[in-house]
Amino acid sequence: MKKTIPVVGMACSACSANIEKKLCSLAGVNSASVSLPGRSALVDFNPDVISLDKMKQEVNNIGYDLVIEADRSVDEIERRAYRLLRRKTLLSWVFALLVMAISMRWIVIGGRNMANQVSLLLALANMIYCGKSFYVTAFKQLKHATANMDSLVAMSTGISFLFSVFNTFWGESVWGSRGIEWHTYYDASVMIITFVLTGRLLEEKAKDSTASSIRQLMGLQPKTARIVQDGKIEEVPISTIEKGDILEVRAGDKIPVDGEVVSAESFMKANAAYVDESMITGEPTPSEKIQGSRVLAGTIPNQGKLRMRALQIGENTALAHIIQMVQEAQNSKAPVQRIIDKLALIFVPVVMGVSVVTFFLWWILGGNVALPHAILSAIAVLVIACPCAMGLATPTALMVGIGKAAQEKVLIKDATALERMRKVNAMVIDKTGTLTIPNKDIDFTKADNLPLEARETLKPYAQEAMQELQDDGVEIYMMSGDKEEAARYWASKAGIKHYKSKVLPQDKENLVRKLQRQGMTVAMVGDGINDTQALALSDVSIAIGRGTDVAMDVAQVTLMGDDLRAIPKAIQLSRRTVSMIKQNLFWAFIYNVVCIPMAAGALYLFGISFQITPMWASALMAFSSVSVVLNSLRLKFMA
């Protein structure tokens, strides 16, 4: 059984990696994939061996929460969490500005001791209320011998606070008596928390935008429906609808479930209504619905009203399947992300080790100010290290890319398919049902006596789509069961150079193998059962949404409508997404490689007296993760 479960409390890639590791270690869990930007876990498990409650308990033990209760609204939980984060961030800025004002002597409170004690109280209040989650999560991580971003924040702020407390009460007697100048660093501990919270607030806002495609799809689901019982019409929650119920849907209403039309009427036609299905199929023209027609949840009658019998409800509707497919795709991981996840598990412990080495080097080599400088350098290293930027680099770009594809009416099943599409340079395409639409009004027993144009029609924009693909360097091979003359005619009509007539299903499979042996990355586009072998064999398999269920089950990519221009769009989107991932990873890697040594004071080795302070380290760390998300969001606005 596969299930997408919302996760609350993740802050960095180490968080998602720890949750994934914990879930995969549980008996009964076959596999788990946790998405940081998606705030969810895709879990394949055996419900006879392990329950959702058990998984929730195990994840809660390491500091996170799985939302499995049906009565808990994920959206409401996330809204509450965001409001709390915003409140803590604003209050933390108040504490930070007060402590900074006291530190800079903009506010004068008695003598030095009094000022330090007031700063102590303000910093402590900030840690207890605004920074509490860092310490709680870090403690839970410590109990399970793991670490994440919260561990780094808790260590850095805890050390700077405790060192400041020591100096507040014993600084003069320990350091002053030896002629060593001493300071407190409450401003550093407060500003670290403030900048990290600010970064997370901005990051949450930005990550929220990466999930907009899912919210748009979920927005197609109405909350209520009109049920017809005993001649009366009553509005009821959609969750109470059962199979076989008769529902009334009026113009402008969203159809609540999948079903069959019982009766329809409109001013244009007495026994028909017209339904806008563009949000599902991409078709701009409303579809005529008469008695016996199938209707889909989320579509909208824009002319007339209809009564329908509910056939598929809840998670079994076509819309629910689309949402589930997009969620699973966004939770899937590209091969490079698997490597990043492994790095994330060791990144934080390595940073802690670098921080300890930095401390001892400065303590040994720092002269009179050895200890204070060693502590500040160690804190700066802890704060500036950012597993978030590396962890967000791939999944945010994938989420936006897969979401953008869904908006273009292209469903991509997993990250591997999206990544592989950019390499496609050969495409095998079935003719009937894919390039052409059979004419439903003809007698096919007499079809041989009819002109080719009368038997079937080239799909709108098919020629344009084929031209775009060929201009992009993709060689297209049309496969047809027709005679040579008919195959040549339709290939010419679509603008395709390579074609083959009188093909059998194994011929398609053989052509795919032949092209692959020539070193080409092959996409197969089909819609029928006879295409499934070739679809399964191809590097990228593309099915037409109006095709058979078997073809769509095998395919990695599904076109929800008949517009073949979606294929070149998807290939271009794949290239842009992979390019964005490379950009994100490059800058995240460069950030850590450059900034960690600068925070440790490496520039002193080259005679440059510059070092990143803990406060600036926290600001840079916050900016690095936000910038990765914002860079990925650029995909949404690319044509």
Please give the residue ranges for each predicted region.
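Conserved cytosolic catalytic loops of P-type ATPases
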Residues: 4, 26-49, 53, 183-186, ...
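Actuator/coupling domain of P-type ATPases
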Residues: 58-76, 117-119, 123-224, 242, ...
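Juxtamembrane helix-loop transition segments at the membrane interface in multi-pass membrane proteins
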Residues: 139-144, 205-220, 396-415, 633-639
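Membrane-embedded alpha-helical bundles of multi-pass transporters
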Residues: 108-111, 143, 162, 404, ...
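Bilayer-spanning, highly hydrophobic alpha-helical transmembrane segments
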Residues: 90-98, 338-366, 378-386, 391-396, ...
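Conserved catalytic phosphorylation-site environment of P-type ATPases
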Residues: 280, 376, 386-451, 534, ...
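Conserved ATP-binding TGD loop and adjacent catalytic N/P-domain core of P-type ATPases
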Residues: 17, 38, 412, 422, ...
